[in-house]
């Protein structure tokens, strides 16, 4: 059935279902404009936080409690922001009007009270979209910290295994 032929109840039920999914999926979705201002997000529902008042705006780094954004007073103002791979990928996507996938970065985020630094590994993808004639990007932010930690441990174990194998070979050769 084409959408325009569905009843308002069916459309509302589908909208409610989609909203519920987005509010409970294990990733942050952020709709941002070319100034890195967050226009919409599921961040608040995932963290069980009250949504900001209507009219209040936040940039991506401010919303995620980026340590550099907090130190500089605003997202994008810290000297380290120029070196941020995620910021560069977003800027390039807006400039080229295209999407990007799986940009990985290690970040230092602050807790809600901004008194504790939390190291975090993220994977960010961005889908370029035009809404009402305005350029936007839908960012998908995955916390991959646990995955990266397991990867680091596996690399250490692999190096230890190689070292043990060399010692074993040397020992056998000297017998």
Walk through the language-model features, giving the residues of each:
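N-terminal membrane-sensor/transducer module of prokaryotic signaling receptors
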Residues: 1-17, 48, 69-72, 80, ...
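Surface-exposed alpha-helical segments enriched in charged/polar residues
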Residues: 20-23, 88-91, 127
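A generic fold-level signal
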Residues: 24, 55, 81, 117-121, ...
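PAS/PAS-like sensory domain cap-loop motif
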Residues: 45-59
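PAS-family sensory/regulatory domains
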Residues: 55-81
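Sensory coupling linkers of modular signal transduction proteins
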Residues: 2-8, 127-163, 168
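Sensory modules in modular signal-transduction proteins
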Residues: 8-48, 165, 173
